[in-house]
């Protein structure tokens, strides 16, 4: 998982990780959390037991979805082969848009060994997903006021500036304000 993170960060492309169920699933948890914290786009694909065996403590059954929900942008367990293409399209869209981050797809054995016609269409909109949050004008006005009142303002920024493509805006802001940046 850490190699996929390195690839994603160095290339600005999606890193992909494929692991087995059980120990494979548990071993990616730290990497998923790290990718979430660092805004690294990852697609984590994990194997899982058959649908009929879910919840029975079957050999190497691990609730990756339950573990990954709080540390990823989106998770889905895929139980039917016909759900594979739409789930992958949605996962890639979510991982790469807005603040990038990890998404997790948990493929049951049924989804892995079944077959369905391959119909893939790129996802470009999800009704309940807002990749770019709305700006609150009151918060912006308050920030301007705080900066104006500050005797020695300093801008400390990270890779979010690069991820959002705001390098020019940042440089214009600090030049106009005469504010040092780190």
Predicted regions mapped to residue ranges:
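N-terminal alpha/beta PP-like core and its mobile active-site loop of ThDP/TPP-dependent enzymes
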Residues: 1-182
């Amino acid at each position: 998982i850490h190699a996929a993170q390195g690839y994603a960060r160095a290339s600005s492309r999606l890193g992909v990780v494929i692991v087995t169920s059980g120990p494979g699933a548990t071993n990616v948890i730290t990497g998923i959390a790290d990718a979430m914290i660092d805004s690294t786009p990852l697609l984590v694909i994990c194997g899982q037991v058959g649908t009929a065996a879910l919840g029975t403590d079957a050999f190497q059954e691990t609730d990756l979805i339950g573990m990954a929900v709080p540390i990823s942008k989106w998770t889905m367990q895929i139980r039917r082969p016909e759900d594979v293409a739409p789930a992958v399209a949605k996962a890639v869209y979510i991982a790469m848009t807005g603040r990038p981050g990890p998404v997790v797809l948990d493929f049951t054995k049924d989804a892995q060994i079944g077959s369905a016609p391959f119909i893939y269409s790129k996802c470009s909109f999800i009704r309940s997903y807002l990749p770019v949050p709305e700006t609150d004008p009151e918060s912006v006005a308050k920030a301007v006021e705080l900066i104006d009142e500050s005797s020695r303002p300093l801008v400390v920024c990270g890779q979010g500036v690069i991820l959002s493509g705001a390098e020019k805006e940042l440089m214009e802001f600090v030049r106009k304000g005469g504010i040092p940046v780190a």
